[in-house]
């Protein structure tokens, strides 16, 4: 079994952050990312990079963090109690993109590595991550292409990989109190270590590198689509689901807050503007109704 090497993972993550920011700046064509580096008193730090008020992106945040601690927090040991009390290192790149145009979907991606140490014992480590898409208006072409890209990057690792992580994504990004998925899913994986370090790292890299391949064509296709107040209002209303999920259910958000992480970076995923409306119901036969009827539940897209 190959030996875990946090140094090579960190180098990949820093390079990935640079490449994704460059790609998003190119797609936007106007705004650029501002970098904000920070250190954590308990150990570690990171760099948050944020683009605001661009031509295409209202807000895009791409965060790198590498934090260390003497004891693992409750959120990380809830499903692995044997790890309680171990020291840990956690590193990752996490991003959320909120476009201006309601016809461009919001998206989220994350790749991460976790390693826990204990004197006299082998380190316990795993990779996690994925990417998911949250459209406001239904375009089957976009969703099928998104999932095809996800499936293609999984195929070298086995025929069962895409169906497994696609299903996990549908289950993870689900709002029980709304009885709907957050969007149309993608990939979600966690606790990945069974194949050994090298192969597990290869898969995490494939997911990180595949994100822009999946997202950029959708942005290019939709960024010039005209929209009005109705579409903007619906976009802001649906953004509320993002806030609800991240603050109530998301493991990464809860982990960051429980470990004394940097609040500005953790809440960077929040949309800059959002609205709630009491007892909203989409008009029958409308594109908004189609989103509810056909897109906010698990489907086999490819």
UniProtKB/Swiss-Prot annotation:
Protein keywords: Cytoplasm, Heme biosynthesis, Metal-binding, Oxidoreductase, Porphyrin biosynthesis
One GO-annotated biological process of the protein: protoporphyrinogen IX biosynthetic process
EC number: 1.3.3.3
Binding site for substrate: 94, 110-112, 260-262
Binding site for a divalent metal cation: 98, 108, 147, 177
Active-site residues from the entry: 108 (proton donor)
Gene3D superfamilies: Coproporphyrinogen III oxidase, aerobic
InterPro entries: Coprogen_oxidase_aer, Coprogen_oxidase_aer_sf, Coprogen_oxidase_CS
Cofactor: a divalent metal cation
Database matches in Pfam families: Coprogen_oxidas (PF01218)
Family (UniProt): Belongs to the aerobic coproporphyrinogen-III oxidase family.
Protein name in UniProt: Oxygen-dependent coproporphyrinogen-III oxidase
Organism of origin: Shewanella sp. (strain ANA-3)
